[in-house]
């Protein structure tokens, strides 16, 4: 009979074959769900599904992609976000240029 704290389905059962030939049950905590995009909610590629204790053992580059908002946004949402921000900056610069040209003519 397992110990009382092991009698829960929140722990996963791992069947381990011992050198003596018998099978024992080890109880481990389950893996977390995948990291998800903050905008669209899709699972993120390049972010491992590990518990925080196991994530601590990985180097920084193995924890998330090395791009802007890596580990927070998916590549598609990041592309849309960058296009939107750059286009708004360009439009603001054009508007400022039009105002300066109009002020110079009058």
Swiss-Prot record:
Listed name of the protein: Large ribosomal subunit protein eL34
Pfam family, one: Ribosomal_L34e
An annotated GO BP: translation
GO cellular component terms attached to this protein's record: ribonucleoprotein complex; ribosome
NCBIfam families assigned: PRK04059.1 (NF003143)
Keywords carried by this UniProt record: Ribonucleoprotein, Ribosomal protein
MF term (GO), any: structural constituent of ribosome
Domain of life: Archaea
Native organism: Hyperthermus butylicus (strain DSM 5456 / JCM 9403 / PLM1-5)
Claim: Ribosomal protein is one of the keywords in the record: yes
Family note: Belongs to the eukaryotic ribosomal protein eL34 family.
Record carries keyword Ribosomal protein: yes
């Amino acid at each position: 009979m397992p110990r009382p704290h092991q009698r829960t389905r929140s722990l996963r059962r791992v069947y381990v074959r011992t050198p003596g030939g018998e099978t024992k049950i080890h109880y481990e905590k389950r893996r977390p769900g995948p990291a998800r995009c903050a905008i669209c909610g899709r699972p993120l590629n390049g972010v491992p599904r590990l518990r925080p204790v196991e994530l601590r053992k990985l180097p920084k580059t193995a924890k998330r992609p090395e791009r802007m908002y890596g580990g927070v946004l998916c590549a598609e949402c990041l592309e849309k976000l960058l296009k939107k921000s750059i286009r708004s900056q360009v439009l603001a610069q054009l508007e400022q240029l039009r105002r300066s040209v109009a002020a110079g003519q009058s």
